[in-house]
């Protein structure tokens, strides 16, 4: 895949080739599971319609959604799809490729991998609608995956001393929060999950870009090199804190309505799941605020910081549109919620009354 070469050839770490190989092997494992699941779905459609193979194989999503799937096969398809997308999301325990790539890969590639939640989208768009009975029966498995990912990644993030690795674990933890919202099977939870997918695509990507700006200036994103950044880089610090506060769900930013809806949806279904979501949000605030205080505030602890310079105009311009969006979505979330309301209703109806 292209990312193998992008990470292996243009990564910033000494272990970039190993990181590229690790990423590729993980993606291959997930891809094989997805291929098997899709092949089973297509073969089942051919069997149901008495069509010849391979001529009768159909990979059209609307067709597959309308094709009956026996319970045993549906459970197998569900598990294969869940595993494949859990690797790509990633969910614990399939997450180890992301922190490695975050430390070794080029910033622009890591920003894409951290920001885009294609694995979560796959679970929402394909795994549960294609196997609705199994998804409803085993929603507790998805809830467990989400809660463990949310809490475990947050606890690991609390111990990090490097900004890039911290952001990688924060991304994994937020994936867990989104999965908790999806698994709640409530309107609030699903709407919050969709909102959070869009929300964290903006926030995580920009935070990783900011870490790239810091690395370009100082040659490191470890906290031992970062103390007192606010004194030398006030513009970078202001932008960083805006997106950092959005990532922990401060009111007035897009993170607040998304996290609030997920927590409400989880509490509606199961108090333990809701408490897990709430604890994940609290831990998220803990690791982000703690690291930010050490890295940006306080005295300057490294001589390279004094010789550095603040964000340039073109760098600020790159961040301007996402900053406006997270503030707009924070103060006026109704637009996003109205847009995904109908889709959320249709998705939930598919799970509560599976067809055919």
What is each residue range found by the language model?
Residues 68-76, 106, 137-148, 229-239, ...:
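Membrane-interfacial loop-to-helix junctions in multi-pass transporters
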Residues 19-22, 105-114, 221-238, 273-280:
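Membrane-interface alpha-helices at helix entry/exit sites of multi-pass transporters
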Residues 1-73, 156-222:
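Alpha-helical multi-pass transmembrane bundles of energy-transducing inner-membrane proteins
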Residues 40, 47-57, 233-235, 288-356:
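Cytoplasmic/organellar membrane-interface segments at the starts of transmembrane helices
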Residues 124-138, 178-198, 265-273:
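Helix-coil boundary and interhelical linker segments in multi-pass alpha-helical membrane proteins
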Residues 19, 75-144, 168-169, 235, ...:
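Short helix-boundary/re-entrant hairpin motifs in multi-pass inner-membrane proteins
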Residues 92, 204-208, 274-307:
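Predominantly late transmembrane helices and immediately cytosolic-facing juxtamembrane segments
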Residues 94, 160-163, 214-229, 291-310:
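Alpha-helical transmembrane segments
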